[in-house]
């Protein structure tokens, strides 16, 4: 809410009604997800996701955990590896060489882990050994989310010229087995049989033209006098109709379900005037069912407890038969955040489908919990969750000639703990010669900038990257460079 005086604002922030605290305690949130190490899950899941297109590798090589320091526990942050190029069509007669350059001279200074990253140039030379031109349908995958897609998407060039790519976004990659390692044979047999993940992504956006019944709040308010600090609340109680009925809401602050009576209640703080009201409609949306016995109630605050009823609160409910896609589109079009960032609404709605199924709003199972969710949280999760994002483009390799492909990415570095203390790491995933015949794969660090490599004996593996090119061997897991700021004693 917006207030006219600093004193009123101070009072509103510091003088919190106990009922509001109780309301927060009783609110039923959708299924929670642990997001602290979500990037670990994303990297592991990409092993399954990207391997389905014919290129498989062991992606998960970084550690989970953290360390104690003078400021308390500091968690590790793990980001996905640089993923290799793959092809969708038969590429017989094409050989591929890969060179990956990690430039740490562009590392940004600042507080870890969010402002430390380098520039990675992942280069490929496709050579045609036949006497006819061959067009390769290539896909370059990376792991990211819709919120950062414009900033994190690799810049693709072919023979030095920028190319326009077609974007396909797979399902969320959080739910795959974390850290599971596969042998090359297992990856070929288990992961590349049908390419289910990519095929689903290539199928395009999922339609949410699902019939729903929406109840829109109209003409609501309070007929009496009130001060700017009065958290007067309108509540809507109703009965749920339908064995598998689910509820979505927009514009409601609180939700309560009475296990004894089976009654649902949604509530919101009444605005003081039209300028304080939400810019989008307040809906109770029934999915796969309906609601009945709707009652409008007023309360002195958001706790909505017996004995705190308030007369003078009024409101009307308009019943609308529509579709879920129409509701979501209306919400996003009237929400400044989504309009300013230029999201593809069809793509975003398609990703909402997966989140709605995770929260049991869609799917049809008889689940007695999580039967209601806020639409804003569903959309927010669809924007922030990680997916394998594919950039698809065609490359024609002339007979007896070659074509050079380059993908430049601003790559976030892992922030990890080890025997040498805190350090940064950038990972590169090798490719299997399944969809493309890789004759060589190398990676190296071209510029360390103000960093130094760490390769302590107790942490050393044969997958360490350095300033000299290192051959990447499929089936051995990620290769990585470990670095830390140059110590003062070495300056």
What is the role of each PLM region?
Residues 31-60:
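Internal signal-anchor transmembrane helix that establishes type II topology
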Residues 57-491:
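Lumenal/extracellular ectodomains and adaptor appendage modules
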Residues 18-24, 28-29, 48, 134, ...:
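Residues in flexible loops and secondary-structure boundaries
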Residues 5, 12, 16-18, 40, ...:
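Short linear motifs in intrinsically disordered/low-complexity regions
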Residues 1-34:
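Disordered, charged N-terminal biogenesis/targeting segments of membrane/secreted proteins
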